[in-house]
Amino acid sequence: ACEKIRQQTGNPHVDYILVDLSDMKSVREAAEQYIQKEDFLDVLINNAADFDLSVKKPILTKDGLEKQFATNVAAPFLLSILLKGLLEKSESGRIINISSQGLMLYPFMKLDFENLAGQKHYSPAKTYYQNKLALLMLSLYMRKHWKGIKIQAIRVTNVKVDMRRYDHLS
């Protein structure tokens, strides 16, 4: 995929870092790998979206976090913290956190801090929207407290998904 992008754009500086966003050790290692190679970072786009309707009960990660929360909230926030120094070195450092159009379905939703891991009641959809709300709230926090870095949260509209990847649902 990187080679195809290099050819299409003419940019030889296209690379990737493999990371498991549900594993905070992997997130730390990926950030460190980037920090070792680069002097600055212009844009960090946090676009994680772990949302599987077939999951009927919370899955805990090695770190003891609910998997969707780890992937959709903890990892983007940790990456932002770890890469903050390189973003500050950029003339136009910015973080773009991708939220969800689906939050419009829940205009009065509040974060349920007592149920972040689904310990009381688990719903993959509600957990996902709670995660996206948490990421939005973290974006507002960072925007207020992190000077010199532009912080944006955007919501995307519905995305066409290849349902064949969910063959376990039929």
Regions found by a protein language model. Name each.
Residues 1-165:
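Rossmann-fold NAD(P)H-dependent dehydrogenase/reductase core
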Residues 168-170:
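Terminal hydrophobic/aromatic helix or amphipathic segment near a protein terminus
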